[in-house]
Design a protein with these regions (language model features):
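Ribonuclease/tRNase effector modules and their secretory precursors
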Residues: 1-92
């Protein structure tokens, strides 16, 4: 699976509010967009870019949902989750 970076993007109003509410910094989003650990297609025109990270002894994912069928791409929302096994797709 090719992992593409996204350089040119905007944050939707919804994304701005959710990032603030969830305590996620825009720099974290930019890091995932530039160098995602994994890209999954959700539906035509929408992808999730995600990367694993460690906090203490717990492994998490930061997932960024992006509409790529427009220019610039639009970050719809982002969130952290400890449910790595549910969302991470191992390469076979």
């Amino acid at each position: 699976m090719a992992v593409d970076s996204i350089i040119d993007y905007i944050l939707t109003d919804h994304a701005v509010g959710e990032l603030r509410r969830r305590g996620i910094r825009q720099q974290e989003i930019e890091g995932i967009l530039k160098n995602p650990g994994q890209r999954l297609d959700l539906r035509p025109g929408r992808v999730v870019l995600q990367s694993k990270f460690q906090e203490g002894e717990t492994e998490y994912l930061l997932r960024v949902i992006v509409d790529i069928d427009r220019s610039p791409a639009e970050v719809v929302t982002a969130y952290r989750t400890s449910k790595v096994a549910k969302y991470w797709r191992e390469q076979v």
